[in-house]
């Protein structure tokens, strides 16, 4: 089987990362998420800080492969860009980011919220059960958590890596 140069590089990278892990007894589903997180960030401290609900990774994997997750929503376009297109196509999954939507810009301006918050509000209106991926905006993650508490969203899963120094810790605590 010819995996291609890019796939070969990724596999070699994952093997290198796995050799460097301090804990070799990590459950397979969490290890998969951890390898990807370290590969993305080049930060081996992820081994100490990555949080995943028990069975969350395997449950989400089964949902995606079972066709139960037709849509992934991202807070920003860069997060959408980082999701492998070949896998999406193979699984029939669509990725959407509402950040550039005109209605989102209008909503953000009229409500006095960030565009990413407005984007999540709009996304939940159309896709309340999607998988939500946050690669930037803590305010968007907080918005989703509020919508979940209000019963307006029941995500298939949440993958959250908000950045910055404002609202980041609060958003991470809210999602737990």
Q: In which residue ranges do the predicted regions lie?
A:
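Electropositive, gly/pro-rich neighborhoods at or near active sites that engage anionic ligands
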Residues: 1-71
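Generic structural signal for short, flexible, solvent-exposed coil/loop and linker residues
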Residues: 6, 23, 35, 68, ...
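Structural recognition of alpha->loop->beta junctions
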Residues: 58, 173-176
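Hydrophobic helix-cap positions at the C-terminus of alpha-helices
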Residues: 60-67, 123, 147, 151
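Conserved mixed alpha/beta catalytic, RNA-binding, or beta-rich assembly cores of soluble enzyme
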Residues: 76-148, 155-164, 168, 172-174
